A protein has these predicted regions:
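N-terminal extracellular ligand-recognition/capping segment immediately after the signal peptide
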Residues: 28, 55-64, 72-96, 102-110
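Right-handed parallel beta-helix
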Residues: 84-208
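Acidic Gly/Asp/Thr-rich repetitive segments characteristic of extracellular carbohydrate-active
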Residues: 29-75, 661-667
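Residue-level detector of functionally pivotal "anchor" positions at catalytic/ligand-binding pockets or at interdomain
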Residues: 641-663
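Extracellular calcium-associated, cysteine-rich motifs in secreted modular proteins
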Residues: 425-503
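All-beta strand scaffolds that present successive hydrophobic residues in beta-strands
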Residues: 75, 97-99, 121-123, 154-157, ...
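Short beta-strands within extracellular/lumenal beta-sheet-rich domains
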Residues: 541-564, 606-611, 631-637
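Extracellular beta-rich repeat passengers
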Residues: 234-425
Length: 685
């Protein structure tokens, strides 16, 4: 008995020690230098490695072909140059695009838009230069240069985006995203858009959205537009810091309806095309959703007259020093159109929108605005090998210049990428810079790591499996190689800054529910968290992140194994004017036509939320059936039942003599420290 008690005590102490150690261990970031709300995205970590070996639009080993392969994936490049697309391109869930691997000058995607259509995505060191060559061919209204919306878990790092038909770089309506160290330049004004003049920088927002150390240059407006989406409009939390905004036109930065936003240490530099007077001093022109707006766009009715909260400090305007001494007086308050707020802008409102402490945000290196100006100009965009266009944008910003201007426009703004053609250039001139390629390093096993690098790090260049071995650092061997290619940039860009915000520790975030919505869909009938519905193709989405379900039909949700669900909340409406729908069955229990009713989409209210406690928790699958012949639009949240006690099971396995750190990562060559081996605590001294 004494021996048994000693063993139990030892196990308890080991468990407590492991939990305590885990509580001090930060989750592994996407890569060194990944910051903000998207800091912990995993992308294609642990998945297959795919090589882009040509610059064709499609076909074997093209970028499109690589993106179309199923499963988690990391895409590396064996070639540099410009990929001229013949149709739009989308990036699916669980993908890492490692543009820094391109041998030579890097990769550019041109002619058609590229967007992110899935969850859990990392994109680094890429160029997206759309242009208007196809605006008349395919009716390119609404073509953004890059971005996406209504998904979750992205980080976009060191990308260069230019020449959009609509916005250059729009990322909004998502959960947990970061856009960092990007160069966003020269959206097109009179490019052929059916709505006429555009030339917009981007829409930025989301439920946990970070935008830091980006250069926004030569846009007529939306630099950025602080843009809520219906999916996130009641939980808009955005951190915007250390961005450089040069030669902003029109309304500059504006919007922010109902949002909570940190606007910290940004550098505003009015250029030759910027407005003078109060608009030239603008930090952000904030407002609300008005009666007129929600009448036209009823999906935004939940945020009617909702004022946001803003933490604004440390922002600098290079032309108007009074802004620097009082951000709120000159950059915020005097930018509000009180007459356009349905009479809601009162003295009390004025006091309520200004907050004295920042909203919660995830760890981000923060510089002064002046220091950020230099850092961004030195390192933003696809800066591993800057092309001539990015170099021009940097030069314009440094020198307060507008080298090229389109017909009929203020200085620095263009109608087409061809407006950048130098005088005297030949007929073979192209707006897209030449990107030279060199020979890709030899990679015998195709695991994304060159042979000589594997040799130098004690790996086997004939076995691809070692690329996905997780090291003591929390990164796979492949990730360590990918990160090493730009380690010097990462170190230099963050020097002289202070890491502010909170980090997330291992085990700190406990999942309490699963969501099935347009936002969590992976682009098909699979969803974040390992959920699946027994349908094929892609789900159609309704308003506010809902998914459309046929009437009088039973659906089966496949749940993660052995996770108990005890409560279901359904937000939704009937996708028909003047008609209702209802929930006919859930988890095997049937309901009448008046129990859980969903109103017509044109009713008032036009949606409803029902929370249903299950008679007993269900595991593995959950069924629901729509009632009436009308289509229903649902957002479904499933609460995970809490359990108490410890289930004791008998389990035997072959011995595993590998060492693991407290995050569960297998360690190939352990150094001094605490490890787990065969379930026992091992200390190497």
């Amino acid at each position: 008995m004494t021996s048994l008690l000693n063993k139990l005590c030892s196990l308890a102490l080991l468990f407590i020690g492991c939990v305590a150690a885990m509580a001090q261990t930060e989750k592994t970031p996407a890569f060194p230098g990944a910051e903000g709300f998207g800091r912990y995205v995993t992308g294609g970590r642990g998945g297959k490695v795919l090589h882009v070996k040509n610059l064709k639009d499609s076909g074997y080993q093209s970028l499109r072909w690589c993106l179309q392969q199923t499963g988690a994936k990391t895409i590396v490049f064996d070639v540099s140059g410009t990929i001229h697309l013949t149709s739009a391109l989308s990036i699916p869930s669980n993908t890492t695009i490692a543009g820094q691997t391109a041998p030579g000058d890097g990769i550019c995607v041109a002619d058609y838009p590229c967007s992110i259509s899935g969850n859990n995505v990392i994109v680094r060191y890429m160029r997206f230069r759309l242009g208007n060559k196809n605006v008349k061919i395919d009716g390119a209204d609404g073509w953004d240069g890059f971005g996406g919306f209504d998904k979750q878990d992205w980080i976009i790092d060191h990308c260069s985006v230019s020449w959009s038909i609509d916005e250059c770089l729009s990322v909004l309506g998502n959960k947990n995203t970061t856009v960092q160290w990007c160069l966003v330049a020269q959206s097109l004004v009179n490019s052929g858009h059916s709505k006429g003049a555009h030339g917009y920088g981007g829409n930025w927002g989301g439920s946990g959205a970070s935008f830091h150390h980006n250069l926004i240059v030569h846009h007529t407006s939306r630099t950025p537009r602080l843009g809520p989406r219906p999916t996130t409009q009641l939980d808009e939390r955005m951190d915007m810091r250390n961005n450089v905004i040069y030669n902003f036109g029109g309304n500059g930065c504006y919007g922010g309806e109902g949002m909570k936003v940190n606007i910290v240490n940004n550098y505003y530099k009015p250029g030759p095309g910027s407005p003078t007077g109060d608009k030239g001093k603008r930090i952000a022109g904030i407002g609300i959703r008005t009666n007129s707006y929600v009448t036209t766009y009823p999906a935004y009715a939940p945020a009617l007259h909702l004022w946001g909260k803003y933490y604004v400090t440390g922002n600098v305007n290079s032309k108007y020093p009074e802004v620097n001494t009082n951000n709120w007086a000159y950059g915020m308050y005097n930018q509000i159109d009180a007459s356009g707020c349905d009479g809601t802008y009162t003295a009390a409102t004025k006091d309520s929108i200004k907050i004295d402490e920042p909203i919660d945000f995830i760890a981000t290196t923060t510089h002064t605005a002046q220091k950020a100006y230099e850092k961004v100009l030195d390192y933003a965009g696809a800066s591993k090998s800057r092309d001539t266009f990015d170099a021009l944008m940097i030069s314009d910003t440094r020198n307060n210049a507008a080298t090229y201007t389109g017909s009929g426009l203020s200085k620095g703004f263009i109608n087409s990428q061809d407006d950048n053609k130098p005088s005297g250039a030949g007929s073979d001139w192209s707006a897209w810079p030449t990107l030279n390629s060199t020979d890709a390093p030899t990679d015998t096993d195709g695991d994304g790591m060159p042979d000589d690098w594997e040799d130098a790090h004690g790996l086997d260049k004939t076995k691809s499996a070692d690329g996905n071995i997780v090291t003591e650092s929390g990164y796979t061997n492949l990730e360590i190689y990918l990160n090493s290619l730009v380690a010097d940039i990462t170190e230099q860009q963050n020097a002289d800054g202070e890491l502010l915000g909170r980090t997330i520790k291992v085990g700190e975030e406990v999942l309490t529910e699963y969501e099935i919505s347009g936002q969590t869909s992976n682009g098909d009938w699979t969803f974040a968290g390992g959920l699946k519905i027994n349908q094929t193709g892609s789900p159609a989405t309704g308003s506010n992140g809902t998914i459309k379900y046929s009437g009088n039909k039973k659906y089966t949700i496949t749940l993660p194994v052995n996770v108990p669900i005890d409560q279901v909340t359904i937000y939704g409406y009937c996708n028909s004017d003047g008609n209702q729908s209802y929930l006919a069955e859930l988890a095997g229990k049937t309901f009448g036509s008046t129990d859980y009713v969903f109103p017509a989409r044109n009713a008032n209210p036009s949606s409803v939320t029902h929370t249903i406690k299950l008679d007993a928790p269900v595991t593995n699958t959950l069924t629901f059936t729509t009632g009436s012949s009308n289509q229903s639009c649902y957002k479904i949240n499933m609460h995970i039942a809490t359990t108490t006690g410890i289930n004791s099971i008998n389990y035997t396995k072959e011995k595993d003599n590998y060492f693991y750190n407290l995050q569960g990562a297998r360690i190939m060559n352990p150094t001094k420290g605490l490890y787990i081996q065969n379930g026992k605590k091992i200390v190497i001294r």
